[in-house]
């Protein structure tokens, strides 16, 4: 379980996050939803360990990780632009992190992930020969072979549309449940958040407006902001 206790963060005297508290269960998919500048990316960076809070704590599996550096947390992120190496093939991108951690995944586990994500026929292609959906799946595979303790996704569907978007959504759910992997998604798209998530966190100007199930968000909005979002 991941627990955030009274997290606050300011920059140059401006409060970006204010007293954020919530708990996320193992294998839950939680979307952080908010408009631009709401603080959702700052919250993602706090969880990842890229920055530290001004106050509050982050507890993961009963361990206080507030001051634990990013590289020791074991949380992995898939960025909005995929951050793939264009000069490498899809396969070499997928196994790139295993160069320094060869025991993290076996060859059979890598093969299973590739099959799960439907990438078998694309392994020898360079990144610029892949579609947006294929790049997203390569980025997911590259992250999953490292066996993250938590999976963080920054706007994973923003560059996709139609059938491809629905396919990636299905695969994210399959991964979270199949690997018992807590998954946190940052998005600005209410439809995306409400259809993929177990819980949705709505942030407005650094404050929690509501944290609940999609049904609660739709049928029991706690503020006019949530109702009109």
Language-model segment annotations:
Residues 145-149:
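A short, proline-enriched helix->beta-strand linker immediately N-terminal to the Walker B motif
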């Amino acid at each position: 379980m991941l627990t955030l206790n009274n997290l606050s963060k300011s920059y140059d005297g401006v409060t970006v996050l204010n007293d954020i508290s919530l708990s996320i269960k193992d294998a839950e998919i939680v979307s952080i939803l908010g408009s631009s500048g709401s603080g959702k990316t700052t919250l993602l960076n706090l969880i990842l360990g890229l920055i530290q809070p001004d106050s509050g704590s982050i507890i993961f599996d009963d361990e206080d990780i507030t001051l634990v550096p990013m590289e020791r947390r074991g949380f992995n992120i898939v960025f909005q632009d995929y951050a793939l190496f264009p000069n490498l093939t899809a396969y070499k991108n997928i196994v790139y992190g295993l160069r320094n951690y060869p025991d993290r995944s076996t060859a059979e586990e890598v093969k299973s992930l590739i099959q799960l994500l439907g990438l078998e026929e694309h392994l020898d292609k360079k990144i610029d020969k892949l579609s947006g959906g294929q790049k997203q799946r390569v980025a997911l595979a590259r992250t999953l072979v490292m066996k993250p303790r938590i999976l963080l996704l920054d706007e994973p569907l923003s560059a996709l549309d139609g059938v491809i978007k629905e396919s990636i959504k299905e695969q994210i759910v399959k991964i979270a449940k199949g690997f018992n992997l807590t998954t946190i998604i940052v998005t600005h798209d209410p439809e995306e958040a409400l259809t993929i998530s177990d819980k949705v966190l709505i942030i407005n100007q650094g404050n929690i407006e509501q944290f609940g199930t999609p049904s609660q968000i739709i049928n029991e909005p706690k503020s006019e902001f949530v109702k009109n979002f």
